[in-house]
Amino acid sequence: MGLPPCGTDAAHHELLSSSAFYAARQSAMEGTWSAEQPMLEDFEVLEVPVVVHVIHRGSPVGVDENISDAQVLSALVALNEDFRKVAGSNGDGLGVDVFVEFVLAKRTPEGTPTTGIVRVDGTVVPGYAENGLASSSFLPGADQVAVKSLTTWYGEDYLNVFVVPEINGNNGGGGVQGFSYTGPTGDARDGVTLLYNAFGTTGTLKPGRTLNRTLTHEVGHHLSLLHTFYDTDDCEAEGDCTTAGDRVCDTPVTLENG
């Protein structure tokens, strides 16, 4: 059986067992869920600065995995349509406006102006030229900490989005299309990782990945939303909706692909 298109659960469990920082943050988050913190009532829109790291393999801008600025911008537009439920867009479905908007960063951590798009050749890291980046240590590909350390912006001031040519040696094809961590990691891993051809709504895209839903899905994870089938393996009774599945009571616990 091949790997699922979302590699978040595997990456999350691996880091949970190896990082005391990440485990502590997850424990704090679950405590917040259990306390059922009330929703803010002023509905102020939260603006999140985004830096997109295009980690290519030497291609010119706009060729192969070194995607164009236009493709990056299309991803941000579609992401906001989904999170803000923009009327008349593909995001205007059954969901709700979550009052979060994503904008390309305008300053670097050092305070200098930026477009919010950073390009770096990842082939200096062993294995990246051949297999891209590995979402977990037991899978093919370059070590993600080594690759992301070339470019990541540390701290909690930005959402790092890493665009890569391959994940786990999949040649940009099937298997994992993207992965994230459900909250801050405290190191270079922090953020969202996606295949270049599953990112955006225009540009170098593959069939079935033209609505930018992979980015929307993985950003949801980064904002601490789990799968509805998280840690479920049978049709047991739902029980406490704050501790089962995605820990959110507006969605029932489900089985993966079931």
Language-model segments: what does each one mean?
Residues 1-155, 164:
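Propeptide-to-catalytic entry region of secreted or membrane-anchored zinc metalloproteases
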Residues 206-258:
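The catalytic-center signature of Zn2+-dependent metalloproteases
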Residues 55-58, 108-110, 165-170, 198-201, ...:
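Solvent-exposed loop/turn segments at secondary-structure junctions
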Residues 76, 80-87, 163-165, 196-198, ...:
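Sec/Tat-exported extracytoplasmic proteins
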Residues 48-54, 101-104, 158-163, 190-196, ...:
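Structural recognition of the beta-strand scaffold that forms the well-ordered cores
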Residues 174-207:
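Active-site scaffold of zinc-dependent metalloenzymes
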Residues 66-74, 205-210, 214:
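Soluble non-cytosolic domains of exported or imported proteins
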Residues 73-76, 80, 191, 213-216:
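Extracytoplasmic/secreted envelope proteins and their assembly/folding machinery
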